[in-house]
UniProtKB/Swiss-Prot annotation:
Keywords: Cell inner membrane, Cell membrane, Electron transport, Flavoprotein, FMN, Membrane, Phosphoprotein, Translocase, Transmembrane, Transmembrane helix, Transport. It is a multi-pass membrane protein. It comes from Pectobacterium atrosepticum (strain SCRI 1043 / ATCC BAA-672). The gene is rnfD. This is Ion-translocating oxidoreductase complex subunit D. The keyword Transmembrane helix applies. The complex is composed of six subunits: RnfA, RnfB, RnfC, RnfD, RnfE and RnfG. InterPro entries: NqrB/RnfD, RnfD_bac.
Amino acid sequence: MAFRIASSPFTHNQQRTQRIMLWVILACLPGMLAQVYFFGYGNLIQVGLASATALIAEGVTLSLRKFAVRTTLADNSALLTAVLLGISLPPLAPWWMVVMATVFAIIIAKQLYGGLGQNPFNPAMIGYVVLLISFPVQMTSWLPPEPLQTISLSFHDSLVIIFTGHTPDGHTMQQLMHNVDGVSQATPLDTFKTSLRSGQTPQNILQQPMFAQSLSGIGWQWVNIGFLIGGLFLLMRGTIRWHIPVSFLLSLMFCALLSWIIAPDKFAQPMLHLLSGATMLGAFFIATDPVTASTTNRGRLIFGALIGLLVWLIRTYGGYPDGVAFAVLLANITVPLIDYYTKPRAYGHHR
């Protein structure tokens, strides 16, 4: 009788890379739709521009490296990076910033390390942080949510201002940022931090128009709920595991709740941290990147909790309004150490 020797893996499932990436992209849709409803068509344009740039940049790089271009592009990893980057950027960020961030994410943060599976840092967050450090003013220039906007923008208006810097009627981004009260608009996290440092109390800050309907800011709670729905969908499908999102959110909520209980006149309420900024996007779509996150169950819990702690620290004491991107990248640095000390012991051997 002939014995056939086979190599691993001995079991297979349908979780191919191409399909996983596609499901993650589809899970972003609820949050993206909420963004479009409250902040206009800008993020859709950014996603489209980033996607085209990512595919071109990855195709050129693969060609120079003598890799199979069509086969590699078909894994949808470049497309997912572009989508995550596009929905993270301000809706009306200039086109050249989107192109710059995407090229940096694909070529420097991904392909320079060897491509998918080799990069130690999340490419989308690398691209985002490059822009945040280089162009902080543009990266914190968000439109007021739809109920507070003085000028309604069509798809064509958004497209024109992204590529020219002004609407067809001549309105600049600075003019569009003013809400119905004539006050320059920022994100809820940025507004809360800036107002708190200027001496205002949390009670006074929450009287501002953007907090009229929600402690997390008009529109932002629905954007986060949209990404939460998408994240729960990924959990039910088994595309991601629960360890990182749960430990991330619990860590963030614990820090926010404890500080608020101790000094409610100096710290933001927990709901502002939970349902504002990029909290749910970071918890379910960015921190769970299988390439750059920890690979053990205990390690994932530590990794997620570390990100939650860093997000709270940066939001509370840092110079930037939101800390998800920096927190994820800093946690990426610790992954080898976390995996080393949390790897399961092989039977019959010491760790």
